[in-house]
Amino acid sequence: MIHSRALRVVGSYGAILLAGVIACAATRVGQSGAARLQIVRADTAALRKKLDSIADAHHGIVGYSVIDLETGARINRRGDETFSTASLIKVAILVTVYDLVAKGQLSLDDPLTVLKIDQVPGSGVAQFLHNGTVLTVHDAAWLMSTISDNTATNLLLDRIIIRRVWAKMDSLGLPHTRVHSKSFLRNSSVAMDSSVKYGFGVTTPNEMAHLFELMALGKAVNPAADSAMLDILEHNTTDFMLQRYLEGARAAHKDGETNAVRTECTLWYLRNRVVACVLTKENTDQRWVLDNEAQLTLANMGLAIVNAFGGVPPAPPSS
């Protein structure tokens, strides 16, 4: 996946940036524990009307799925229609990695060696590391999920095998959520016809939203693993789509971008926990600029969803 936020460095700066990205986990202080705010019963009919209005104005196809985890309320548009994921499918890879760890078939400390032959373009820093650099499974999972590192993603797929991602998604009742190949390596596809149609991966708004719902409920792998994965996704660096107008909102999220595709799925920790997945395809505006139409569409939908649930809650008082 190539996009405007791709972190590009050369020489020794790659290793420096890599260390900084991984180290941020040790220094970031998340929002926590203050007294729980009263939940909001959103007017979902009004929210649906607002989201449909935004989607209707978009020059492309928009699907969405929104779930209020506190009340169980759900709304969707084209919820069961398949869309290209771009890098959003990396969430399914992350879940499979942690599932294999939980089963004792993989360790987060297992080494992964970066070889020149493994390095692919697009997002990330691992493509710039020197031949023979050793990461751990945890390092690669972190890089894949926070800066959408394509080389780190491929190292993980080599270790876990693509079909295991399919099997894990099937076990969760997500039969249309599929990764097809390694990133930027179409010839590694295990489903070439689907690769040609959808690219790197495919899902539906309802299925990807349900995957985030399962993580929020501790049912994707187990409560400890799901909590760890959501913590990683809270460190995602993308802030120009669903999160654009929501400064201060706590969110675990992942996005994807190709020329004609913009996607993002998020778990917001508002007064309610709210999952939202917005997928777009066949976008007329294919510019790689901040104000790309699809990115603005997602930004406006994100604002509408959060406002329907009472807006961004106040930050907890500092201790």
Functional labels for PLM-detected ranges:
Residues 18-41:
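Bacterial Sec-dependent signal peptides at the C-terminal "C-region" and cleavage site
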Residues 61, 133-136, 141, 154-212:
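Mid-domain, small-residue-enriched loop/turn segments at the edges of structured enzyme/sensor domains
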Residues 72, 84-112, 276:
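Active-site SXXK
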Residues 33-54, 159-161, 210-240, 246-250, ...:
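Structured C-terminal helix/loop/strand segments within mature extracytoplasmic catalytic/sensor domains
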